[in-house]
A protein has these predicted regions:
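Proline-aspartate-enriched helix->loop->beta-strand connector
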Residues: 353-355
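Well-ordered, non-membrane alpha-helical segments in soluble/globular domains
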Residues: 258-269, 311-320, 405-406
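Redox- and metal-dependent alpha/beta enzyme cores, enriched for Fe-S-associated oxidoreductases
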Residues: 272-333
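A short, acidic, amphipathic alpha-helical segment used as a generic capping/interface helix at domain edges
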Residues: 339-350, 364-368
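Short His-Asn-centered micro-motif
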Residues: 263, 285-287, 334-340, 358-363
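Long, compositionally biased, glycine/small-hydrophobic-enriched stretches that function as flexible linkers
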Residues: 1-279
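C-terminal functional extensions of proteins
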Residues: 360-420
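Short, solvent-exposed amphipathic alpha-helical segments in soluble enzyme
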Residues: 299-305, 350-351, 373-377
């Protein structure tokens, strides 16, 4: 299985120079890297498909009855758009992950700070500059990430046992983090369901979804940890100045969160595959970090607010290669500056009727993209970038990101042979 573009280590990394693992073999310098087993029978996408089946089986075994009730409540009471059973299962696993990982961090922030941050996000009676300065000051003082602890692949993040009455505070905290806000909708729905139960039953269900995540952390580390060996090095290398970065929660994700994003993308693709194939029009949206050396001068890179397409100016550009690869499929390739602005992305592309959209994005950003497109009722398939290559969040010097060309063709056309 090849990748669209070159492998791209180029001696510059998110952390430093290329490192050597305990076996003496060189390790990828990136936070995650999906190319490590490229070309082997046990490639990333095959391993992911197998593990995703295991995850769904485990959720059915541990929480099948809860899943039944969650789906029924969302569709009949909350009037949510129907989703596949697999996607609903991932909602439960996400609730377990978010409450376990971020419950303690949220609890350290006073409620008044969260209220003020939310007010400042929409306040109109102050000048924009003043509002922004006040919000930035509160954000920097209270919304901090934990620094300095090395988290190895096999290490399980300590679980925070979430009480049901603590969920509203966690939801407000998530909405203030910028990069974790996509999880708040699922927690809001989950809290609404728990409030229909007796206190003891609600506590039991809360503990059971956290138990699911406990199992997932260990199982995913064994199945997918090979692809996220760089996470622990990256987290350990962060400095105190990290807490002045607006993207600190994006950069601070644990290995288990990357694994969860991998499985969620796979399950989401399965759930929408048939609807996507029925769409008469196909689009592919790739991030600007895939552009080549001529990106700053490319006519296709000067959009002036219009949709950006490849002009074929640079034969070595990964966007050009993806465009050429899909030439016969009639799928049009467009560029987005960064899918991190997923709400804007969804607002723009959800206006395209009867259109299936393939979105390529970094795994750290993928959950936000999935949540935004799901809320916008878009028919999508999701392709993770092979590694995060942008200078804005990860690297000292940008390295053009790549994507797996076989998987891209499979998602768009269904022509690649791979186990469903």
């Amino acid at each position: 299985m090849g990748s669209t573009g070159v492998s791209g280590s180029a001696g510059v990394s998110a952390i430093g120079d290329e490192t050597t693992g305990p076996t003496g073999q060189s390790e990828s310098p990136f936070v995650y890297d999906l190319r490590l087993n490229e070309g082997s029978p046990e490639s990333y996408f095959n391993e992911l498909a197998t593990f995703s089946d295991e995850v769904l089986d485990q959720i059915e075994k541990q929480a099948g009855a809860i899943l039944d009730r969650y789906i029924e409540y969302n569709e009949l009471i909350l009037q949510e758009m129907p989703t596949s059973r697999g996607e609903a299962a991932m909602d439960l696993l996400t609730v377990g992950a978010v409450t376990s990982i971020y419950g303690a961090s949220a609890g350290r922030v006073p409620a008044w700070v969260l209220r003020e941050l939310q007010k400042l996000s929409w306040k109109r009676d102050r000048p924009a500059l003043t509002t922004g300065m006040l919000r930035d000051a509160l954000f920097a003082a209270f919304m901090k990430v934990d620094l300095g602890r090395r988290v190895d692949v096999a290490d399980r993040s300590p679980r925070f046992s979430m009480e049901v009455e603590q969920l509203p505070h966690l939801i407000e905290w998530l909405q203030c983090t910028i990069d974790l806000g996509e999880s708040s909708r699922r927690l809001i729905n989950w809290l609404s369901l728990l409030r229909t139960l007796t206190p003891s039953q609600a506590s039991d269900w809360m503990a059971r979804v956290q138990d699911l995540f406990d199992w997932f952390q260990t199982a995913a580390g064994e199945a997918l940890g090979n692809y996220t060996r760089g996470v622990s090095r990256f987290l350990a290398a962060r400095r105190p100045s990290e807490n002045r970065r607006p993207d600190r929660f994006l950069r601070g994700k644990k290995a288990a969160e990357y694994h969860l994003a991998m499985v969620a993308a796979e399950i989401g693709n399965r759930g929408m595959r048939h609807a996507f194939r029925r769409c008469p029009r196909k689009l592919v949206i790739v991030p600007a970090c895939m552009r080549g050396a001529n990106a700053r001068t490319s006519p296709g890179g000067q959009s002036a607010g219009l949709d950006v397409t490849c002009e074929g100016c640079d034969p070595s550009c990964n966007v050009n290669k993806a465009t050429a690869l899909l030439g016969l499929s009639e799928a049009r390739v467009y560029l987005e500056n960064c899918p991190r602005t997923s709400v804007r992305l969804a607002a723009r592309w959800s206006q395209e009727p009867r259109t299936g959209v393939v979105i390529a994005a970094c795994l750290a950003i993928m959950p936000s993209v999935q949540a935004a497109t799901r809320s916008a009722r878009m028919t999508c398939q999701f392709l993770p970038l092979d590694f995060p290559g942008c200078q804005s969040h990860w690297l000292r010097h940008r390295i053009p990101a790549t994507s797996n060309e076989s998987e891209l063709v499979w998602l768009v056309t269904g022509s690649k042979l791979r186990r469903l």
